[in-house]
Amino acid sequence: MAKKSKIVKNNKRRDIVARYAQRRAELKQIIQSPTSSYEQRLDAQRALSRQPRDASAVRLRNRDAIDGRPRGHLRKFGLSRVRVRELAHAGQLPGVRKASW
């Protein structure tokens, strides 16, 4: 079980990323565009650097949806490997079967 404060902090980051996502995408497009002038790129880079650090999606951490475990996250289920194993053995994940060959 992860600390509640870490889970809450990650959720706040997720909200901040969603709030700034469109503006960040616009600025990045200006920076990467070959048609934009040097001054436009410089202004876009400055505007991007003025945004909050937590507005970057790279700072998000994938966590287990049930207990917030930060490691061993399986995207397909949104759970950690430990939780997937427990739920699969209990038959609570539809369509998941133990391998047999």
Curated annotation (Swiss-Prot):
Molecular function (Gene Ontology), one example: structural constituent of ribosome
Source superkingdom: Bacteria
Q: Which GO terms describe its biological process?
A: translation
Q: Name one GO cellular component term.
A: small ribosomal subunit
Q: Which PANTHER family match?
A: 30S RIBOSOMAL PROTEIN S14, SMALL RIBOSOMAL SUBUNIT PROTEIN US14A
Q: What does this protein do?
A: Binds 16S rRNA, required for the assembly of 30S particles and may also be responsible for determining the conformation of the 16S rRNA at the A site.
Classification via HAMAP family: Ribosomal_uS14_1 (MF_00537)
- According to UniProt, the name of this protein is Small ribosomal subunit protein uS14A
The record's gene field reads: rpsN
